[in-house]
Amino acid sequence: MDRGWSGLTLDSSSLDLLNPNRISHKNHRRFSNPLAMSRIDEEDDQKTRISTNGSEFRFPVSLSGIRDREDEDFSSGVAGDNDREVPGEVDFFSDKKSRVCREDDEGFRVKKEEQDDRTDVNTGLNLRTTGNTKSDESMIDDGESSEMEDKRAKNELVKLQDELKKMTMDNQKLRELLTQVSNSYTSLQMHLVSLMQQQQQQNNKVIEAAEKPEETIVPRQFIDLGPTRAVGEAEDVSNSSSEDRTRSGGSSAAERRSNGKRLGREESPETESNKIQKVNSTTPTTFDQTAEATMRKARVSVRARSEAPMISDGCQWRKYGQKMAKGNPCPRAYYRCTMATGCPVRKQVQRCAEDRSILITTYEGNHNHPLPPAAVAMASTTTAAANMLLSGSMSSHDGMMNPTNLLARAVLPCSTSMATISASAPFPTVTLDLTHSPPPPNGSNPSSSAATNNNHNSLMQRPQQQQQQMTNLPPGMLPHVIGQALYNQSKFSGLQFSGGSPSTAAFSQSHAVADTITALTADPNFTAALAAVISSMINGTNHHDGEGNNKNQ
């Protein structure tokens, strides 16, 4: 079987289908199969050409194993059936270069494609040409909605983070403010504690100053009531009020303000003439009030041996304060009389630092109400002693009055070991020491009770006779007589005037007072009798101390 080469024939009429204007019915016919394969023998290789007049392009193709019969039938059948000229062939598989002979260059036409002016052709790749179904659209919508939700969640997260930062800053500011408030509170508390300590120190200084003995004592003349007395009244009243506040543990703020205003008015600067006019226009009531204000400063201290916390003196007392005194480990208790409303009598009770068995009771003031029989003796004795103490002048500096002094003999004509007048205390104080046993009286014969009816006038007219009668009185009646005599004698000292000229009355009675005092102090039996009476009175009430204390407190 001959080996030849075959060619691939392309019919150009297929290209004419796109351009119907180029179809030529003169030389060509339309075939159903535009691509025709024809076999070309190797002898006809030289005759191979490309026809420029035809519409076909021949491509020489070398085929092996093709039968000659099939080649002949194929070539003859194509040529016979179609009755047309075989177009030029192009051999793409030939080892030799094909020589293209162009016999008629003018008849060769090149196809020129015209551009299509249609613009509705979509040249893009449309992957969804079949249209989106509902499921596809829902998937797209779901994707878009999820993205929006993510964005919203991120925005909310950013907002929450900003709010958290703001809250953190506010919390930090609140912490700083709380720290500042705590520091301020601590500083204020420390300041308050320091102020309280300073106030306590000032109060202690005031108490120590009140208890400390004074170096110098200004003489006081209670008989001569003139402008000088009126000028010094404000100072005396202020000292008394301050001492009362110290004993009672302090008064209210309103009372302090009122006292300050009153003292400011009293101590306001005035001319001397105005002061003299005010003193001259003073009524006897003013003298009585001044005397009572001064009488409150006089104190009578009684020293007695007693195991009870308080001596039963017949009055009812209420404890309103207690404090520790300097130099004495035993506390000092303060009592006021509760038998009548507004009674000015006060007393202080304290154990002796050297001897705990000795109980010191200090009385101050006069009762303004009737007293029971059990309280008359002690009240009369203390009142008379205070009145006699304030009737003279204090000029002693060493704290002990001279036994030859008229005042010491007038108050209580006892020995210096029993009756003591302290001029160095903050206030004039009479101390009655009942801890020593007095000597027995020489004349102890009981006398009749008619001697108790002797009044003060007979005593003043007959001092020697009255002195002898007083020495013969029973011990239970002697304090009443002594107290009445001393109280009546104090009326002539210028403290309690009822009318008339004070200076004239004091001058007229001065000689009688001197005679009475001389008569009382002449006999030593009077001293022993007085001490025995007071001792018996104190010792007689010791067995009632427990009941009296429960009742009084």
Curated annotation (Swiss-Prot):
Q: What triggers expression? A: By salicylic acid, ethylene, jasmonic acid, pathogens, wounding and strongly during leaf senescence.
| Record's compositionally biased regions (Polar residues) | 276-292
Q: Which InterPro entries match?
A: WRKY_dom (IPR003657), WRKY_dom_sf (IPR036576), WRKY_plant (IPR044810)
Here the segments flagged for biased composition (Basic and acidic residues) are 111-120, 254-275
Q: Does the keyword Glycoprotein apply?
A: no
Query: What subcellular compartments does it reside in?
Result: Nucleus
Question: How is expression of this protein distributed across tissues?
Answer: Roots, leaves, shoots, flowers and siliques.
Concerning SMART domains, the annotation shows: WRKY
GO MF entry, a single one: DNA-binding transcription factor activity
Which family is it part of? Belongs to the WRKY group II-b family.
UniProt function note: Transcription factor involved in the control of processes related to senescence and pathogen defense. Interacts specifically with the W box (5'-(T)TGAC[CT]-3'), a frequently occurring elicitor-responsive cis-acting element. Activates the transcription of the SIRK gene and represses its own expression and that of the WRKY42 genes. Modulates phosphate homeostasis and Pi translocation by regulating PHO1 expression.
Q: What is this protein called?
A: WRKY transcription factor 6
Q: Encoded by which gene?
A: WRKY6
